[in-house]
Amino acid sequence: MKLEMICTGEEVLAGQIVDTNAAWFANTLIERGVECQRRITVGDRLEDLVAVFKERSTEADVIMVNGGLGPTSDDLSTEAMALALGVPLVENKEWRSKLEAWFAKNARVMAESNLKQALLPQGAIMIDNPVGTACGFAIKLNQAWLFFTPGVPFEFKRMVKEQFIPFIEEHFPLSEPVSVKKLLTLGHGESALADKLEVIPLPKGVTLGYRSYMPYIEIKLFARGQLAIDSLATIETEVKKILGHSVVAEDITTLDQEIHNSLVNSGFSLSVAESCTGGLIASGLVAFAGSSAYLHQGLVTYSNEAKVKVLGVNPQTLDDYGAVSIATVEEMAKGARGILDSDYALATSGIAGPDGGSDEKPVGTVAIALATKYGVYSQMLKLPSRSRALVRSLGTAIAYDMLRRELLGEAVIVDYSSFSRFSK
C-alpha cells in the first residue's frame, strides 16, 4: 500500500501554526508497519487543491487529507474534491441531523454557514466525528481512496484511531508482522546516543531510530518480520546495558505519564514545592485525568519569603547556603510533605538563566529533593543551559525520575552521564 498525506491551510503553509497532526499521523502509522511515503501541504486555493487531488490519486493507494472542512469561506477541501470528481455536492441528511442536535444540546444557535459542513461530494461515504461539527468522508478518485478529516487535532486523532486505521487494516493487511519497542532516555543528546549504540549489530528487518523532544530522546526499535521480532528482546537488553540509568521509561511518551500511572495504581499521595520549575511538575501531572486522587498540592514558592512563610524553610539555611542548595530544597520538600501529610513531596530550586549564575553556582545549577516518610533524597546538578526552558524541563524530568525510582524501589540518585553533580 502506498500511503500519502495532504495537509491544507494557508496558516500551515505559511508556518503560522506547526502541523502537529502530520507528525502524529506518520508516527502512529509507522508503529503499525505502515509508512507514509509522501506529505504535501497546500494552501486554501481551490485550483491548487483540485490539481493535487487529481495528481496524487493516480499514484497513491490511500490519501489522508487533513483540514479544510470547516464552515468558513476558506474551507475548500470538500468543494475541491467534488470538482476533481466532476460531481455535485449533496446534503448528507444524517450529518445535518447530528449538527442540529449538537447545537441544540449545547444551547447554541446554528449559523447558516454550518450547513455547509453537511454537504459532501455525491457518492462519498460519511465518516462520523463524535467530538466536532465537521464530519469526514471517504471517496475514491482514480486508483486512490481519499479520506477527508478536520484539522482540529483531537478530532483528527480520534477519527484516525476509530475509523481510518480499522479501514486500512481490513483493506490493506500487512504482508508480514511488525513490532515496535520504545525506550525513553534522559541525559544524552541524539548524536551521543547514536555513537554509543552504533556498536550493536542489527539483524535484517530491525531498524533503530531516534526522536528528540525536550528534554527526552526516544529510541525506537522497529522490527518487520517474525525473525526480526524474535531478536528485539536481545537488542533491547543490549541497549539498556549500554545506556544504563539514562533509560528512564519504556513504551510511554513522557515521565509525567509514568508517574501518574504509578501514583494512581499505588494509592500514594504527592505534594510539590517548586521554585525554578515554576509549576511544571504539578502541571505535567494535572494534565492527566484522575490526578486529583494523588496530587495534594502544587506550590510555587519562588521568593525566599514564600519558602520561609509557606514551607517553613529556616531563614538561617537561606543565609548560610542560599536558595539554590541541597539544604534549602530538603527543607522545602519536608515542609511541603508536612502540610498535608503527603506520602511524598518533590522540591526544586535552581538558576534557569540567562542571568543569575556565579562561578560557584553557574546558570543551569538545579537542586532537587524528594521527601518520604523515612527521609529525604537530594542532589544538585549542573544541567545544560542552552535555554531557560531547557533547564526547567530537565529539572522537572529529573524530579519525576527520582520519584519514579523510589516508587519502584530502585536507587533514587543515579548517574545520568552527561549531567555533573555537585558534592554538596
Curated annotation (Swiss-Prot):
Protein name: CinA-like protein
Stored SMART domains: MoCF_biosynth
Pfam families: CinA (PF02464), MoCF_biosynth (PF00994)
Organism of this sequence: Shewanella woodyi (strain ATCC 51908 / MS32)
Family (UniProt): Belongs to the CinA family.
NCBIfam families: cinA_nterm (TIGR00200), molyb_syn (TIGR00177), PncC_domain (TIGR00199)
